[in-house]
């Protein structure tokens, strides 16, 4: 597979609407790299994991690319280099992606004991796209580690795995969406400042069945339940239940695929904001949860989500903005 990599067909493609922003704003402190992990019941064999990555990467056009700089926009080009090396985890997670140290790829695969880690520069894909790739990587690894699996399941991608790379923002864009994002200064949590590239991690494990039951009792979804708990925790631990002239704001990513019948493996999400304005003392948890849930439900619907991303796409399609050289775009983005 590694010998064949140099003969891959060279293709180029545009970044999706959201992806255009990430190469411009990525820094050592705000890397725009996310991590997905999967834990097996056995120790990881790094050589087999490398073989699995070598095998599936050419199948995923959304991951098998390098980032190029054009006159007006960044763009993707097929990466003909061998797949990035699988490494034993030894650094902070979610470090800034350094393509020149990674065969020009924009993702990393590492392992630690029984865990497989996939770190992705958001320019490639959102969490759902990353999950698709990680699941197939794990499946291929298990086929290599346990050949009897091939006898039962075959040596091919799951029928549920999408390789679609459409820009679903452009496909579902609707003209005449005048509203943009509204923002205001929000309350900022304070704490010990880590050095650049350092990343603090707190791992918590919850029994899914009990979380589902707790959310069901309160007539909310799991996402709404966790968002409400998070907002209430900030309110109690940082504001101590006091009045604040700055609101507590949660930015919640929403997977747009179910609303627009998309199966893309690229970015297709929108951000909505749930705002708690502490204009009185001692909100109860129920009161905070009600405010957060109502804010989310008002925004997480097809009509509102369509307006959000259509506004962004309209800026990208603006002829005057498209004609501005990339070097100038980077100064204002």
Annotate each predicted stretch with a short phrase.
Residues 37, 121, 199:
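Conserved short-loop catalytic and cofactor-binding motifs
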Residues 76-77, 165:
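Conserved catalytic core of two-metal-ion nucleotidyltransferases
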Residues 77-82, 120-124:
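Secondary-structure transition/turn motif
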Residues 111-113, 216, 221, 245:
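Short, well-ordered loop/turn elements at secondary-structure boundaries
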Residues 137, 141-145, 234, 296, ...:
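Short, well-ordered alpha-helical segments in soluble proteins
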């Amino acid at each position: 597979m590694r010998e064949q990599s140099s003969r891959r067909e060279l293709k180029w493609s545009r970044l999706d609407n959201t992806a255009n922003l990430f190469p411009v704003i990525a820094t050592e402190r705000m890397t725009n790299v996310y991590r997905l992990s999967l834990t097996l019941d056995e120790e990881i064999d790094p050589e087999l994991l490398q073989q699995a990555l070598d095998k599936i990467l050419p199948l995923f056009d959304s991951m098998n690319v390098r980032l190029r700089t054009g006159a007006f926009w960044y763009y993707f080009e097929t990466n003909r280099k061998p797949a990035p090396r699988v490494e034993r985890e030894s650094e902070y997670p979610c470090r800034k992606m350094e393509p020149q140290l990674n065969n020009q790829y924009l993702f990393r695969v590492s392992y630690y004991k029984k865990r497989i880690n996939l770190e992705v520069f958001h320019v490639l894909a959102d969490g759902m796209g990353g999950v698709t790739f990680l699941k197939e990587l794990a499946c291929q690894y298990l086929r290599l580690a346990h050949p009897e699996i091939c006898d039962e399941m075959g040596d091919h991608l799951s029928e549920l795995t999408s390789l679609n790379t459409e820009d679903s923002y452009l496909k579902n864009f609707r003209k005449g969406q005048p509203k943009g994002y509204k923002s205001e200064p929000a309350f900022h949590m304070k704490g010990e400042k880590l050095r650049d590239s350092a990343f603090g991690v707190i791992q918590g494990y919850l029994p899914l069945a009990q979380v589902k039951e707790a959310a069901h009792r309160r007539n909310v979804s799991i996402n709404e339940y966790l968002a409400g708990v998070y907002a209430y925790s900030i309110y109690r631990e940082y504001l101590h239940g006091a009045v604040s002239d700055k609101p507590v704001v949660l930015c919640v990513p929403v997977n747009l695929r179910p609303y627009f019948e998309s199966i893309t493996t690229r970015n297709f999400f929108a951000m909505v904001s749930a705002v708690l304005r502490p204009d009185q003392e001692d909100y109860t948890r129920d009161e905070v949860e009600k405010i957060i849930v109502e804010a989310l439900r008002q925004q997480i619907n097809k009509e509102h989500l369509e307006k959000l991303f259509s506004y962004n796409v309209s800026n990208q399609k603006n002829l005057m903005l498209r004609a501005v050289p990339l070097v100038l775009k980077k100064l204002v983005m």
